[in-house]
């Protein structure tokens, strides 16, 4: 049975003064309350999903004006009046059986149905209208801010607007050493563009492309937003960061890999255009 949410509360749980779990207490439409827990990886999936649904709500607001605005306000007021209170033990002694292992959305025009798998192997089905998404984002954000865990907050903020699909060592083009980062197809479908990205570094004999990546993002290619994103990735992606710490990063390059937004590209469909882009670009350096 699919449940509808009439109220939500969030509380961040810390361990050794660092963020550990996000407690989420949900009130159903029949006023029954349940508390679940999200680790960082699942919480990131939830935030990315809610950001996408909130963006769709903004689009509908632009199309439908005051009527849709009133609908959003009414929904947020209802949620605000039905915030369930935590019991002290729910935050101090989390029930591991209610740890969320994964979330998988099924998309509809104005809502998504969230299939939630728990540690105890129970499966929940939650309907989340798009007009609730912004409220849920704010609830999670407020709980995170209360932790004062600046390191985790910076980490979260730096990885919400892209997905790293592949990191590639391009120092030896005769053998592409790569690392694949797997993401569920639903998550990939939330990002519009596949980009091949190259990083060139200063060497004694001149400039050379030493690393690359294939990412998905909603940042329009060749914009300041995309350029800043690519530079940020160089500072946070482990393989890239190691090179940046040893060598001076001179230039970054990007190129769209043509594909439908919902298409999940194969290894060859990612590596081949990245390799060809690298050969073309290296000639210009």
Language model regions located:
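Positively charged, low-complexity terminal tracts
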Residues: 1-285
């Amino acid at each position: 049975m699919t449940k509808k949410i009439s109220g939500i509360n969030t509380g961040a749980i810390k361990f050794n003064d660092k963020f550990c779990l996000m407690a989420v207490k949900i009130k159903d439409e029949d006023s029954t309350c349940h508390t679940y827990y999200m680790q960082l990886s699942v919480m990131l999936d939830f935030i990315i999903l809610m950001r996408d649904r909130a963006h769709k709500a903004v689009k509908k607001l632009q199309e439908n004006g005051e009527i849709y605005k009133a609908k959003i306000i009414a929904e947020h007021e209802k949620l605000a009046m039905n915030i369930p209170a935590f019991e002290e033990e729910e935050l101090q002694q989390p029930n591991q059986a209610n740890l969320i292992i994964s979330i998988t959305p099924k998309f509809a025009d104005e809502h998504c149905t969230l299939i939630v798998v728990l540690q105890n192997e129970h499966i929940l089905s939650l309907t989340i209208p798009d007009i609730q998404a912004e409220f849920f984002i704010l609830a999670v954000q407020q709980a995170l801010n209360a932790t004062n865990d600046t390191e985790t907050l910076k980490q979260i903020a730096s990885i919400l607007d892209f997905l790293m699909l592949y990191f590639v060592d391009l120092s030896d083009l005769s053998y592409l050493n790569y690392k694949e980062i797997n993401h569920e197809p639903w998550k990939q479908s939330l990002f519009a563009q596949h980009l091949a990205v190259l990083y060139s570094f200063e060497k004694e004999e001149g400039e050379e492309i030493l690393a690359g990546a294939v990412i998905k993002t909603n940042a329009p290619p060749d914009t300041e937003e995309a350029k800043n994103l690519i530079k940020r990735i160089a500072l946070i992606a482990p393989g890239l960061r190691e090179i940046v710490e040893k060598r001076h990063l001179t230039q970054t390059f990007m190129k769209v890999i043509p594909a439908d937004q919902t298409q999940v590209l194969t290894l060859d469909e990612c590596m081949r255009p990245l390799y060809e882009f690298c050969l073309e670009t290296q000639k210009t350096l």
